UniProtKB/Swiss-Prot annotation:
Similarity remark: Belongs to the HY2 family.
GO molecular function, one term: cobalt ion binding
Pfam family, one: Fe_bilin_red
NCBIfam families: PRK02816.1 (NF002760)
Free-text function comment from the UniProt entry: Catalyzes the four-electron reduction of biliverdin IX-alpha (2-electron reduction at both the A and D rings); the reaction proceeds via an isolatable 2-electron intermediate, 181,182-dihydrobiliverdin.
Gene: pcyA
Keywords recorded for this protein, A-Z: Oxidoreductase
Catalyzed reactions per annotation: (2R,3Z)-phycocyanobilin + 4 oxidized [2Fe-2S]-[ferredoxin] = biliverdin IXalpha + 4 reduced [2Fe-2S]-[ferredoxin] + 4 H(+)
Protein's organism: Prochlorococcus marinus (strain MIT 9312)
GO biological process, alphabetically ordered: phytochromobilin biosynthetic process
EC number: 1.3.7.5
Name the record gives this protein: Phycocyanobilin:ferredoxin oxidoreductase
C-alpha cells in the first residue's frame, strides 16, 4: 500500500465528478470553513497491485455549525466506485445530518441514497415539508430501507438508477437537499444548555452505531485490509462520535 497526498480525485466517472462538484460548491457556502488535519495514512490510500487496485481519497473540513464535513471517493479493482459523504453537525447547533452515498458496479448505479437525518428530537418538523416537495417522481427502482435505517428521515431517498436521465435527476435531488441544509445551517443559533447538547450528541452516536451495522462497508474493505485496520477506519474516518 502506498499513501499519497492528493489534491483532487483521480476518478474520471462523470456522475461522481458532477456530484462531487455540487457537494464541494455547497460546502464552500458554509461560514468559517476550515480543513481538518488527519493521519495521512487514513486520508489518501493507493494500491497498484494487479487485481487489487485500490484508490481512496478523503476530504475533511469543519465549519460553523458542523464538526466534520467528510467526503470519500473510492475505487476498488477498477469495477467498484463509491462516493460517500456525511456532514456531521456541531451539537451546539440544531442542524440535521446530511448523508449521501453512490455505489457503481461496472458502471451500473446499484445504490444512490441521500437524506437529511434528524440529529435531535422533533427536528424533522423544521425541514421534512421541504424535503417532501423535492420531485422524486421520475425514479423507477426505489429500494427498501434496511432495518437499521430508522435513523433516516421520512423523506430519505434510496434507489438504483436505471438511466442517464435518472442519474441527472438524482443530482438534482442531492442539490436540493444540500440547499435545504445550507439554509438550515445559516438560520441555526448556538445552544448552550448541556442537556440539549448531550441529547444531540446521543443522536449522532446512534446514527454512527446504526451505520456501522451496514456490513457491506466492512465486507468491501476486508478484501484489501485486515480487520483491525478496517475497524479503525470505520470508527475514526467514517463514523466517529
Amino acid at each position: 500500500m502506498l499513501s499519497e497526498s492528493l489534491t483532487k480525485t483521480k476518478l474520471t466517472d462523470p456522475l461522481i465528478l458532477e456530484l462531487l462538484q455540487n457537494i464541494r460548491e455547497h460546502r464552500s457556502m458554509l461560514e468559517d470553513l476550515k480543513s481538518i488535519k488527519v493521519d495521512p495514512e487514513l486520508s489518501n490510500i493507493i494500491s497498484n497491485e494487479i487485481g487489487r487496485e485500490l484508490y481512496i481519497e478523503n476530504e475533511f473540513h469543519k465549519a460553523r455549525g458542523f464538526r466534520k464535513l467528510h467526503i470519500e471517493v473510492a475505487e476498488f479493482s477498477k469495477n467498484l466506485k463509491i462516493l460517500h459523504c456525511v456532514f456531521f453537525p456541531d451539537p451546539k447547533f440544531d442542524i440535521p445530518i446530511f448523508g449521501m452515498d453512490l455505489v457503481k458496479i461496472n458502471d451500473i448505479v446499484s445504490a444512490a441514497i441521500v437524506d437529511l437525518s434528524p440529529a435531535s428530537q422533533n427536528q424533522g418538523v423544521k425541514y421534512e415539508k421541504f424535503l417532501s416537495k423535492v420531485d422524486k417522481s421520475s425514479f423507477t427502482s426505489l429500494r427498501e430501507i434496511p432495518k437499521w435505517g430508522e435513523i433516516f428521515s421520512e423523506n430519505v431517498f434510496f434507489a438504483s438508477l436505471k438511466s442517464k436521465s435518472e442519474e441527472n435527476d438524482f443530482c438534482k435531488v442531492v442539490d436540493e437537499y444540500l440547499s435545504i441544509l445550507i439554509k438550515l445551517s445559516k438560520e441555526a443559533k448556538p445552544e448552550f444548555k448541556e442537556e440539549i447538547i448531550k441529547e444531540r450528541k446521543n443522536y449522532q452516536k446512534n446514527y454512527c452505531v446504526q451505520q456501522m451495522k451496514n456490513e457491506k462497508t466492512s465486507m468491501v474493505l476486508l478484501k484489501y485490509f485486515d480487520e483491525k485496520w478496517v475497524n479503525n477506519y470505520i470508527k475514526t474516518v467514517l463514523f466517529d462520535f
